[in-house]
C-alpha cells in the first residue's frame, strides 16, 4: 500500500499553522474592536451599536472557529488522524460555502445595504444636538471623525450640532484652507458634511474586505485539497 507523502503532510501542517495564526489575529482584532473606547464612542447609540456589534461578534465567532479548525488540521496532519482531517475538511467546506453565500447575498442586496447605511446616518444626525450622556459619547466619536475627514456635521454641516455647537471648543474649525470653508456663528468651519466621507470610507474598506475574502477562499480551497489528499493517503496505508 502507498505511504503518506511527507511533502503533503508537512505542507498541510504549515498551511494549518498559518490558518491557526490567522484565526488568532481575527479573534484578537475583533475583541479589541469590541472593547476599545474609540469603538464604544462611535457605536454608543442604541441603533448603531446593536447592528455594529453583531458584526463584531460574528468576527469573534469566525476567529474562534478558524483557530479550532487550524488546530484540527495541524494535529490531524502530524498524528495522521483520519477523524481530525475529516472534521477539518467538513468544517472548512462549511465556512467556504457560507462565504460564497454571504458574497452572493451581499451582491444581491447591495442597494438595500446602501439604503440602510443612509437611513442610519440620517437618523443619528439628531444625536448631535442632543444633551444626554450616551449621546455625548456618540458626539465625541463624530468629532474625531470630523478631524480625520475635515468635515462638519453629518447632513447639514455645522447646523446639525444645534445648541451644542458652542459646547465643544474648536468644533469644525477650518484649519485646512484648501478645503471648502464657511462662516457659522462667528467662526470659519468646514462646509462639507461628513456623510459622503463616511460612505466613501465604508466603500473603500468593503473592497478590502472582498479582497481578503477572495484570498481566504483560495487558501481554503488549497486546504480542502491538501486535507483530502492526506486523508486518502492515510486510508490507503
Swiss-Prot record:
Residues 34-57, 110-205 are extracellular. Its main location: membrane. Structural component of specialized membrane microdomains known as tetraspanin-enriched microdomains (TERMs), which act as platforms for receptor clustering and signaling. Participates thereby in diverse biological functions such as cell signal transduction, migration and protein trafficking. Promotes ADAM17-mediated TNF-alpha processing through recruitment of ADAM17 to tetraspanin-enriched micro-domains (TEMs). Forms a complex with RICTOR and integrin alpha3/ITGA3 to mediate mTORC2 activation and AKT1 phosphorylation leading to cell migration. Keywords: Cell membrane, Glycoprotein, Membrane, Transmembrane, Transmembrane helix. It is found in: Cell membrane. Glycans are attached at residue 118. The lineage of its organism: Eukaryota, Metazoa, Chordata, Craniata, Vertebrata. The gene is TSPAN8. GO terms for cellular component: plasma membrane. Residues 1-9, 73-83, 231-237 are cytoplasmic. Forms homooligomers. Interacts with MEP1B. Interacts with integrin alpha3/ITGA3. Interacts with RICTOR and MTOR. Interacts with ADAM17. Interacts with ECE1. The chain crosses the membrane at residues 10-33, 58-72, 84-109, 206-230. It comes from the Eukaryota. It is a multi-pass membrane protein. InterPro entries: Tetraspanin/Peripherin (IPR018499), Tetraspanin_animals (IPR000301), Tetraspanin_CS (IPR018503), Tetraspanin_EC2_sf (IPR008952). It comes from Pongo abelii. This is Tetraspanin-8.
Amino acid at each position: 500500500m502507498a505511504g503518506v507523502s511527507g511533502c503533503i503532510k508537512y505542507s498541510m501542517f504549515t498551511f494549518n499553522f498559518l490558518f491557526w495564526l490567522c484565526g488568532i489575529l481575527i479573534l484578537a482584532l475583533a475583541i479589541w474592536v469590541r472593547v476599545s473606547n474609540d469603538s464604544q464612542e462611535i457605536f454608543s447609540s442604541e441603533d448603531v451599536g446593536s447592528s455594529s456589534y453583531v458584526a463584531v461578534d460574528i468576527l469573534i465567532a469566525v476567529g474562534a472557529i478558524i483557530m479550532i479548525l487550524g488546530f484540527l488540521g495541524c494535529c490531524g496532519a502530524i498524528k495522521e488522524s483520519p477523524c481530525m482531517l475529516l472534521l477539518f475538511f467538513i468544517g472548512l467546506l462549511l465556512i467556504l460555502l457560507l462565504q460564497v453565500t454571504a458574497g452572493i447575498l451581499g451582491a444581491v442586496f447591495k442597494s438595500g445595504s446602501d439604503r440602510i447605511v443612509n437611513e442610519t446616518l440620517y437618523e443619528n444626525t439628531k444625536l448631535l444636538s442632543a444633551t444626554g450622556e450616551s449621546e455625548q459619547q456618540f458626539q465625541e466619536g463624530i468629532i474625531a471623525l470630523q478631524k480625520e475627514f475635515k468635515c462638519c456635521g453629518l447632513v447639514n454641516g455645522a447646523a446639525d450640532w444645534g445648541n451644542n455647537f458652542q459646547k465643544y471648543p474648536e468644533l469644525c474649525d477650518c484649519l485646512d484652507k484648501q478645503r471648502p470653508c464657511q462662516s457659522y456663528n462667528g467662526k470659519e468651519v468646514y462646509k462639507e458634511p461628513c456623510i459622503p466621507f463616511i460612505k466613501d470610507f465604508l466603500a473603500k474598506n468593503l473592497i478590502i474586505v472582498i479582497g481578503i475574502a477572495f484570498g481566504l477562499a483560495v487558501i481554503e480551497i488549497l486546504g480542502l485539497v491538501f486535507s483530502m489528499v492526506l486523508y486518502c493517503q492515510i486510508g490507503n496505508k
